[in-house]
């Protein structure tokens, strides 16, 4: 039986698509995209949001019944990320955090050393930690061993739209993981989303692919459909790849000479 719900820690979600909020031109556009996506969990960069609701973003998520997932976007050290997560816990009354510790502004790739340090401290402090990490199976396993509730490997660098540049590594992460694997970053279009699920990911997190699309709401709907299609295809079991062609139906028809039926 296909397990339709996504389980992270002690919570279940009907949608396997997690949305980000960065890049939207305005809140009205963001609202249309969020509704079209069907998401139930959406990241919020705590350093860019007025926790009192001044930006309207938190109010919007509340109206839509979407759970905000604070993240530590922009942090460059473990100490900075831990402090940001603690502030988010106080402001939003949640111990869930998407952990980001970025090495530099040009690549926006995770700093593996600082990421693990931050994860260890936050887990010890009672957080449900979802770390944005490189597509490195060893690092993903290390983060799981620290007690992270999921691992979130990148498909390609944030905002590039390059899709999944190392699918084999994603498959290795999935094969070794004992926690949900959420592909995070680099998605460009719906086919990338479907591939992520076919590779074995439990969920997908994206923002730019939707918020900067020509029609964000339409792209959000496409991403939602692609995530569902990719997940169902994986559960259904694809046929094995073959070098040579194979007829879908055996050849059983026999031929006979004209007039055979009449006995002539």
From Swiss-Prot:
CC per GO annotation: cytoplasm
Residues that bind 1-deoxy-D-xylulose 5-phosphate: 159, 185-186, 207-208
GO molecular function terms attached to this record: thiazole synthase activity
GO BP annotations, alphabetical order: thiamine diphosphate biosynthetic process
Keywords: Cytoplasm, Schiff base, Thiamine biosynthesis, Transferase
Catalytic activity: [ThiS sulfur-carrier protein]-C-terminal-Gly-aminoethanethioate + 2-iminoacetate + 1-deoxy-D-xylulose 5-phosphate = [ThiS sulfur-carrier protein]-C-terminal Gly-Gly + 2-[(2R,5Z)-2-carboxy-4-methylthiazol-5(2H)-ylidene]ethyl phosphate + 2 H2O + H(+)
InterPro entries: Aldolase_TIM, Thiazole_synthase_ThiG, ThiG
CDD domains (alphabetical): ThiG
Enzyme Commission code: 2.8.1.10
Uppermost EC category: transferase
Subcellular location(s) of the protein: Cytoplasm
HAMAP family associated with the record: ThiG
PANTHER family referenced in this protein's UniProt entry, alphabetically: THIAZOLE SYNTHASE (PTHR34266:SF2)
Functional description taken from the UniProt entry: Catalyzes the rearrangement of 1-deoxy-D-xylulose 5-phosphate (DXP) to produce the thiazole phosphate moiety of thiamine. Sulfur is provided by the thiocarboxylate moiety of the carrier protein ThiS. In vitro, sulfur can be provided by H(2)S.
Similarity-based family: Belongs to the ThiG family.
Subunit structure comment from the entry: Homotetramer. Forms heterodimers with either ThiH or ThiS.
Protein name, UniProt field: Thiazole synthase
């Amino acid at each position: 039986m296909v397990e339709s719900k996504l389980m992270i820690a002690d919570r279940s979600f009907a949608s396997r698509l997690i949305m980000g909020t960065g890049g939207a031109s305005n809140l009205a556009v963001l609202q249309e995209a969020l509704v079209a996506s069907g998401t139930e969990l959406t990241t919020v960069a705590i350093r860019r949001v007025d926790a009192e609701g001044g930006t309207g973003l938190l109010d919007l998520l509340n109206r839509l019944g979407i759970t905000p997932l604070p993240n530590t976007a922009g942090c460059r050290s473990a100490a900075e990320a831990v402090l940001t997560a603690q502030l988010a816990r106080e402001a939003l009354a949640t111990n869930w955090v998407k952990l980001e510790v970025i090495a530099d502004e040009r690549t926006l790739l995770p700093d593996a050393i600082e990421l693990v340090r931050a994860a260890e401290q936050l887990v010890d402090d009672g957080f449900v930690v979802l770390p944005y990490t490189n597509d490195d199976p060893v690092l993903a396993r290390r983060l799981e061993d620290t007690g992270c509730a999921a691992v979130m490997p990148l498909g390609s660098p944030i905002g590039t739209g390059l899709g999944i540049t190392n699918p084999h590594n994603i498959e290795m992460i999935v094969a070794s993981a004992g926690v949900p694997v959420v592909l995070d970053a680099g998605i460009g279009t719906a086919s990338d989303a479907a591939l992520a699920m076919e590779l074995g990911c439990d969920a997908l997190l994206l923002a730019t692919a939707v918020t900067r699309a020509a029609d964000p709401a339409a792209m959000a709907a496409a991403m939602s459909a692609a995530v569902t299609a990719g997940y169902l295809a994986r559960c259904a079991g694809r046929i094995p790849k073959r070098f040579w062609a194979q007829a879908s139906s055996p050849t059983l028809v026999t031929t006979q000479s004209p007039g055979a039926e009449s006995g002539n």
